[in-house]
Amino acid sequence: MSSLERMLGILDAFSEAAPVWTVDALGETFGLSRSTAYRYVKDLCKAGLLAPVGGGGYSLGPRIIELDRQIRNVDPLLTAARDTLRDLLPRVGEGILFICGPRGDAVLSVFLMENPNTLDISYSRGRPMPLFRGSASVVILAHLPEGRLRRLYREHAAVIAKAGLGNDWIAFRNALRAIRARPYLTGRAQLDPGVFAISAPVFDADGNILASLTLAMPEHRADKEDVDSLADLVREGAARITAAVASRAPLTPVAAGSMR
């Protein structure tokens, strides 16, 4: 692991449960000398990623708020999702439409829109969720590269077995292949009681998994309505987002001299 990776890894320590850290506590947690921990914290503060809060404590810094605003306004996935979900929402009835993307060995809810509903779902924006449970997560998992799936199985075999995805590598691989072959994935009360979910994959311009689009709705709707018709709407939305993301060509780098 490079020194940059170790320094940025410090940010993972900050959470709702532990929003403030001292240099000494960070050094102890990450196995760093005090001088190294101090240097990392100093550099992160300089970049605006951390900020002092008094008493020797540090919290996440204002640069993160700035980056969040930029992501909300111009991120290709969120821009495409906003336009698509706005059109889709009146057609799906009671429930919540949300987008999740992979982050490390978890998934992160990054955007949602909702019709009036009584649901209480775990996928609130910015909250990491398990990779092996819930259709929004598993549909992403199924499309990850095989090399990454092998590593995930080595490191999380017990969790994978508990989630019903296979008791050995072959069974795990075959389960994901079967999921990958389907146009959508459903889940009933897998994370939240009373919630039925329909998820479809979203891909980037190169055909790699980028995110999932999910409709979460009251479980009773799945017992009374045509799930396939609702799934067609989710698939339509996922395809539209995929196409919109692919249409946004990367910017050509600007030569340093031309920026003066």
Which stretches of residues belong to each language-model region?
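An N-terminal domain-start capping segment
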Residues: M1-T22, R86-S109, E236-M259
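Amphipathic alpha-helical effector-binding/dimerization core
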Residues: L60-E155
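N-terminal helix-turn-helix
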Residues: M1-V74, L78-T79, A239-S247
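Sensor-regulatory modules in signal-transduction proteins
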Residues: V202-A205
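Short, basic/aromatic recognition patches
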Residues: A81-L88, Y153-S199, A244
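Juxtadomain coupling helices with adjacent low-complexity linkers
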Residues: W169-A171, R182, P193-G194, A211-R260
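Short, structured helix-loop boundary elements
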Residues: M1-L4, G61, V74, L78, ...
